[in-house]
């Protein structure tokens, strides 16, 4: 592979693994690791057809050793330079079947298209019960909606969850297919 291609791939990897994982459709675990297959799929979405061998070459030849592969070469992460928080010191937790997200009804269409994104935060915040989700929703102006998230299914599909000390459930991103179609509304 030529140097220009290696640099392009390296820049995309840096962006996805250090700064904006969701842009490549990635969900980093607490320590910054993500499945190599997910990274390859994300690179394809950005016009870079990359094989495992290509990825291993970029990792091996990076002059700054920006990336690391796990011992079994199944996962990859950036070694440093994250603008996203990758280690909260929280152990991954198995969520309940459903979690809830309270928000403004005006963003519902976008959520149904794109899923729940963390925005400026490092994680999407979810509630374990409807009452708490409604309290969160009421912090926003206008009509509210409480979305139900198939959290256990997400977890079973390999998407990590954490629970903070104050009981808020955290995950990197909730893809739209995990947001149930029916919800509770309030004026």
Can you describe what each PLM-predicted range is?
Residues 1-187:
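Eukaryotic, polar/proline-rich low-complexity intrinsically disordered regions
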